[in-house]
Amino acid sequence: MKASFISGKRFVIGLPYAWLLVFFVVPFLILLRISVADMGSGAEPFAPLIDYSTDAWRLMLAFKNYIAIFSDGVGVSTIYVDAYKTSLKYAALTTLLCLVIGYPFAYFLARCKPSIRPGLLMLVMLPFWTSFLLRIAAWKGILADQGVLNNLLLWLGVIKAPMVMLYTDVSMLIGMTYVYLPFMILPLYANLVKMDLRLLEAAHDLGASSIDAFWLITVPLSKAGIVAGCMLVFIPAVGEFVIPSLLGGAENIMIGRVVWDEMFSSNNWPRASALSVVMIVLILVPLALFYRSKDTAEK
């Protein structure tokens, strides 16, 4: 009986690891394998790594795909490096905007009456019930020259001529912030709602103002939620390509769009895989910092 219980416990614990192995580790290894291969000929998108044509098998690793990312043979390859810089910049700005907007909302959500809390949570999750592309297309209609926002501002007399808002940095940031805002609010709310309010009462009894209590108690105690929300926003925002393509300008080339073009337009699977591997490595850095800060907070 005890042995079957232990084996069943191991099976349940092992399921998440098996899921991660099948859907994360194995695809990453496939991606890594393609990234060190040459371009294929004919219908094959990439060449094999092992040459079986001779008696002595040869392992053919092509690291030129990684070299081409950072060097074009003359100097630094500005196309790919600029795409990485642009992706990191807009992902960081999106994360900052989501934090600035999401923290007050999550704070209000955690402190409001329990009777209205489910309705507010439903409003946060409501966008997930509609198509991602439809939501972005709706923003195109709002931000267009003859769109809802320009017509409203003209009617109010705020502006005299339509403003150019679509296909700009601002429109792209609006779209990305709108899409990823729930990913910031939900972990912040989950963290703030569990906070012991007696700590704030004790701070007030000791003479602390509401602002001092917020910065000295609430914010430090919600650090785990802040970091979790930032990671949930930053990581997918780095590889975003749909929103920049539909709302951003031609100069806003992010790495997700570059990978798409290399894969489907140029049919250069090895180069696209190498770009993806480098992007994963860049994302692993803040992820490692997240787990390090989490361990420090728990200690």
Where is each model-derived feature located?
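Short membrane-interfacial helix/loop motifs at transmembrane-helix boundaries
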Residues: 26-78, 143-147, 249-250, 299
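Transmembrane alpha-helices
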Residues: 15, 126, 178, 184-198, ...
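Membrane-interfacial helix termini and adjacent extracytoplasmic/periplasmic loops
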Residues: 54, 136-177, 211, 247-251
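Glycine-rich helix-loop "coupling/hinge" segments at transmembrane-helix boundaries
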Residues: 241-269
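N-terminal signal-anchor/first transmembrane alpha helix
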Residues: 1-38, 108, 118-124
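C-terminal transmembrane helix and the adjacent membrane-cytosol boundary/short C-terminal tail
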Residues: 2-3, 11, 189-204, 270-299
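Transmembrane alpha-helix signature in integral membrane proteins
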Residues: 75-108
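Cytoplasmic-entry segments and transmembrane alpha-helices of multi-pass inner-membrane transporters
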Residues: 12-13, 104-139, 200-201, 214-215, ...
